[in-house]
């Protein structure tokens, strides 16, 4: 059985919110948690699930060099609701015939180190309606870059999620799963004694663009999303790391 911990204040699940003091908030990959967050911790990632949109608000995880290798494969795996999340979720019927693909936030390919951990990426708590060309194209290229960075620096901290914005695409299915306007990804690594970060925003459409044009500082992304990324870092280190980015450092 897959390992899952669903955290709720005082052990109670309320309509649309849960919070825990038990999750290790010193984990660098986690944004600052809010009292209204419904936090679901899996073997390899953490999801802040939103029962209104039927998608995560964000997914965060640490990816090490060793974890980029392994024998687990995605063949035969399929998306399903997480039965232990006692909130409304999407299901497969919502996506069928919608014109939108089931887009992983924590990609299955980052979890080759464990078949069980890879299975856990196939929950709708880790999924958003995504343009198929984006999913197979620029977004996939960025996910591969993250694995390259994990191998180069030994470890990478990743936070990724949807941006609803004006909700210009509406919803899909009987569950009214909200289609994001765009997607974000924030990345942090330690190189020597310095921390370096970069962020990306990609619109939910096909791209024939350069990834450099989607890049921004984590500070800029925080302004767009309202999230405080990498909140466990001390304030001075975080501020220095997040205020800018160097494309040459990331080989973009």
Walk through the language-model features, giving the residues of each:
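Positively charged n-region of N-terminal signal peptides that target proteins for export
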Residues: 1-4
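Bacterial N-terminal signal peptides
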Residues: 7-15
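Domain-level detector for secreted/extracellular nuclease and nuclease-toxin modules, and
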Residues: 16-252
């Amino acid at each position: 059985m897959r390992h899952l911990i669903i955290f709720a204040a005082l052990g109670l699940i309320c309509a649309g919110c849960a919070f825990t003091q038990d999750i290790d908030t010193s984990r660098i990959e986690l944004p600052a948690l809010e009292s209204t967050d419904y936090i679901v911790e899996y073997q390899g990632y953490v999801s802040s699930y939103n029962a209104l949109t039927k998608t995560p608000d964000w997914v965060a995880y640490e990816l090490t060099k060793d974890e980029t290798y392994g024998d687990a494969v995605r063949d035969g795996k399929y998306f399903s609701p997480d039965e232990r999340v006692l909130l409304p979720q999407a299901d497969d019927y919502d996506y069928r015939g919608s014109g939108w693909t089931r887009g992983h936030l924590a990609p299955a390919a980052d979890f080759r180190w464990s078949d069980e951990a890879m299975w856990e990426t196939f929950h709708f708590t880790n999924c958003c309606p995504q343009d198929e060309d984006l999913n197979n194209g620029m977004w996939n290229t960025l996910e591969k870059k993250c694995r390259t960075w994990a191998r180069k620096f030994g470890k990478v901290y990743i936070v990724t999620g949807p941006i609803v914005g004006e909700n210009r695409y509406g919803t899909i299915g009987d569950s009214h799963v909200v289609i994001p306007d765009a997607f974000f990804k924030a990345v942090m690594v330690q190189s020597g004694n310095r921390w370096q970060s970069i962020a990306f925003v990609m619109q939910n459409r096909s791209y024939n663009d350069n990834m450099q044009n989607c890049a921004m500082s984590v500070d800029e992304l925080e302004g767009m999303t309202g999230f405080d990324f990498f909140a466990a870092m001390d304030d001075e280190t975080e501020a220095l790391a997040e205020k800018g980015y160097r494309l040459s450092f990331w080989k973009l």
